[in-house]
UniProtKB/Swiss-Prot annotation:
MF term (GO), any: iron ion binding
Coiled coil: none
Lineage: Bacteria, Thermotogati, Thermotogota, Thermotogae, Thermotogales
Cofactor(s) listed in the protein's UniProt record: [4Fe-4S] cluster; [2Fe-2S] cluster
Name of the protein in question: Biotin synthase
NCBIfam families: bioB (TIGR00433)
Family: Belongs to the radical SAM superfamily. Biotin synthase family.
Amino acid sequence: MVRNSRLDICSIVNAKSGICDQDCKFCAQSSLYNTGVKRYPLLDEESILEKAKEAEKMGAVRFGIVTSGKRPTRDELLKIASIIEFLKVTTSLRICASLGTLEKDELSYLKDHGLDRYHHNLETSPGFFQNICTTHTFYDRVKTVENAKSIGLEVCSGGIFGVGESFEDRLELARILKDLEVDSVPINFLIPIKGTPFENFPELDVVERIKTIAAFRIVLGENVTIKIAAGREKLGDFQALAFFAGANGMIVGGYLTVKGRSYDDDRKLVEGLKELMGW
């Protein structure tokens, strides 16, 4: 449990869906797998604003623009920068982006247009990474995190668990994230998606999920936000335990291709947590 903390709530928009040539084996958006996911190009600013306003109503303080693919085109980057600028004057949200591998000048350009935080998961340990993706490397991801940190952006970077990794892989990832001095760590648990190579993977049980959250809190210390994200719904009635184990943030409103909990369910959870935890 993290004392004297604040519940960090964020929401995301799937701003560009599918059309990805990478082979991340857990992901519905890879064009290499037949998952039936919707495919569409970058949304316009009004569509993204609509999602941002929904996030505000749900109590989110951060809003992330997420696009599929290894990296955006130059035209997409320019449009996203304009959208970020638009959101900064039309909402009270802090704006995050998850656009894949970017260079320092590209990240600086987004920061100049109002970007507060960059999200780029490392996913798992360097030794296990090739088991979940072969079209880019673990160190490609590390470089992007380092690029974002070096130009003064906040960084959100975490992993996905239940993909066949060992507990030591999880601990190694936590130690690397600590060394990188990231600001926020999302904890995602595999949701097996039909059509992906991991569609038949067994899901982690509640105890294993709680142990993972607790281990990350022990390694990361108290100054880093730990957010429960994809798969948190599978904790069911034990979801509050995640916060006693060390989480102090969560994603609301659903994920990229998977629905999350209902607004009413999350509202009740947040109200209860604030009372229990003193947030």
